[in-house]
């Protein structure tokens, strides 16, 4: 084929809805591009849009980009994707520009410091396991919004594209995490993060995530993975990711030195109270990637963490471990269904209730912890 060009259209969605209106179009039928021997070509075009509405978790203004491959006036192929207009940055801030009068390295969305009030979330359903419906995804987002949760860490893998669509639409700040976890090798010399033969796999998993998801405005942090060692393979993965997308900061809890921000897991309240002052030898801004482990009668001291974190801007926030119990349905001898966990199926060995850490039950009913989180957040 020859004499092909692309027509771009930009639509603005109504807030929290999918109906939209045309904002702008761009079509340059005279632009010339040469394809390679495989018939491929990369085309970069710029469309300037005035008076855009910014995307935030409170006002998630979503735009839809439609690209049409044209031959003359004939449409050969069409693609579309969601996007949004918002900035994410980490910058050194003088005391005169900080609401608390403290100079520091802070995290900003659309030029304003933001607190990420979050949860870690796994895909789970007590009947279908790791396969969940779109209806469940939306119900979970609604429950989160009602509990003042504005942030999710996609522990520990990228989610279904529809989940990102929902987070774009309803307003959730995402830390999108690559599907890398190898802590059975622990963090010493045996860690796969050090092994050269696994370097390509580390890079591939990070870049596959980025290539698929880069246009989603809800993603405000990339994560290189979870508990997978501190080695050089993650340095290469970070460099590859930043070369592709420099618009978002990158987090990796197992090696803060190689990424853009600090993070840890399960710090004490006493440590947090000291660290938020900005004088500790850690990388700022800081995000607690896992805290407030919610097994059993838990989350009672969440307010103590947040009184500390909200006293300065050195901490961006954190993500509770975790959102939903990873239970499965089982049945009594009488045929009564119940939410079961390790050991209830006659399995030996087992981890007992160790996946029952959610602030909601596996059937999406809120626990008492849910209401505590709602109050504090």
Predicted regions and their residues:
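Substrate-binding/catalytic cleft of secreted carbohydrate-active enzymes
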Residues: 141-144, 151-361
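Secreted/periplasmic carbohydrate-active enzymes, especially glycoside hydrolases
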Residues: 1-160, 166, 170-171, 205, ...
């Amino acid at each position: 084929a020859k004499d092909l060009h692309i027509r771009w259209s930009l639509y603005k969605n109504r807030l929290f809805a999918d109906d939209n209106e045309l904002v702008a179009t761009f079509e340059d039928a005279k632009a010339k591009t040469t394809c390679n021997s495989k018939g491929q070509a990369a085309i970069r075009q710029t469309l300037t849009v005035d008076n855009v509405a910014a995307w935030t978790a409170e006002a998630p203004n979503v735009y839809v980009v439609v690209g049409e491959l044209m031959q003359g006036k004939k449409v050969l192929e069409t693609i579309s994707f969601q996007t949004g207009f918002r900035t994410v940055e980490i910058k050194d801030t003088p005391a005169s520009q900080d609401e608390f009068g403290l100079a520091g390295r802070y995290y900003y969305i659309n030029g304003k410091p933001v607190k990420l009030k979050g949860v870690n979330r796994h895909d789970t359903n007590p009947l279908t396991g790791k396969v969940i419906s779109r209806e469940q995804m939306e119900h979970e987002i609604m429950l989160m919004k009602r509990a003042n949760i504005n942030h999710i860490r996609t522990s520990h893998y990228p989610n279904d594209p529809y989940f990102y669509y929902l987070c774009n639409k309803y307003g959730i700040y995402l830390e999108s995490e690559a599907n890398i976890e190898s802590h059975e090798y622990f963090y010493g010399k045996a860690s796969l993060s050090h092994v050269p033969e696994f370097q390509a796999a580390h890079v591939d998993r990070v870049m596959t995530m980025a290539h698929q998801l880069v246009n989603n405005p809800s993603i405000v942090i990339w994560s290189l993975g979870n508990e997978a060692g501190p080695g050089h393979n993650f340095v290469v993965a970070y460099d590859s990711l930043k070369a592709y997308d420099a618009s978002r900061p990158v987090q990796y809890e197992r090696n803060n030195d190689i990424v853009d921000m600090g993070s840890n897991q399960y710090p004490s309240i006493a440590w947090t109270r000291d660290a938020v002052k900005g004088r500790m030898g850690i990388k700022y801004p800081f995000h607690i990637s896992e805290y407030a482990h919610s097994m059993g009668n838990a989350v009672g001291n969440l307010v103590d963490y947040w009184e500390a974190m909200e006293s300065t801007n050195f901490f961006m926030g954190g993500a509770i471990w975790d959102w939903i119990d990873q239970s499965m349905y089982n049945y009594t001898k009488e045929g009564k269904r119940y939410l079961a966990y390790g050991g209830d199926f006659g399995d030996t060995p087992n981890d007992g209730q160790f996946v029952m850490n959610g602030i909601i039950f596996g059937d999406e009913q809120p626990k008492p912890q849910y209401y505590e989180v709602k109050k504090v957040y």
